[in-house]
Amino acid sequence: MSDVTVAETPAVKTPTKAPKAPKSKTTKEPKAKVAAAHPPFINMVTAAISSLKERKGSSKIAILKYITANYKVGDQLTKINSRLRAALNKGVASKALVQSVGNGASGRFRVAEKAAATKKPVAKKPVAKKAATGEKKAKKTTVAKKTGDKVKKAKSPKKIAKPAAKKVAKSPAKKAAPKKAPAKKAAAPKA
């Protein structure tokens, strides 16, 4: 065994990976969101339902036909259909739409108008109260000339409030004028 000489194999150099040049980090600019060629689906649905004016409400198929005919939503009907279903379900959940017949996205849908009609009178009442309370504070100042007309209507039953509302800024001048007028009339017959 000692006679056998082992031929030395040249050491194979493992190819050392050249240090990669660090890639210059190019900050990819976020793609600007391209504005859609159509409004949100819930707006398109409400527009479709209101323009179709069907007595029992509009079906999903009729709404889909209206949207594809009037808006640029693309050619992929499966995507449009799924977004339409989602918009209908969301509209029913948020009470913007009323489902008159059916379950889920099937059936007939109408725009909920009763909720909008009941909200408007409620909003008007607090505004009138605020104007009335603001007028009480503003009697001493000359700022509330424009709101005087509105307050006159609200406080017409009270006799004390009427003169105060009419004579917001000119009350001293008007009071002085009636006092002088009787004096002149009294003086005129004597002379």
Swiss-Prot record:
Primary location group: nucleus
Signal peptide extent: none
Keyword terms of this UniProt record: Acetylation, Chromosome, DNA-binding, Nucleus
Cited SMART domains: H15
UniProt modified residues of type N-acetylserine: 2
InterPro entries: H1/H5 (IPR005819), Histone_H1/H5_H15 (IPR005818), WH-like_DNA-bd_sf (IPR036388), WH_DNA-bd_sf (IPR036390)
CDD domains referenced in this protein's UniProt entry, alphabetically: H15 (cd00073)
Keyword Disulfide bond recorded: no
Start-end of Low complexity biased regions: 7-19
Location of this chain's protein in the cell: Nucleus; Chromosome
A GO cellular component annotation in the UniProt record: nucleosome
PROSITE patterns: H15
Additional remarks: H1.2 is a minor form.
Family to which this protein belongs: Belongs to the histone H1/H5 family.
UniProt protein name: Histone H1.2
Organism: Caenorhabditis elegans
Organism lineage string: Eukaryota, Metazoa, Ecdysozoa, Nematoda, Chromadorea
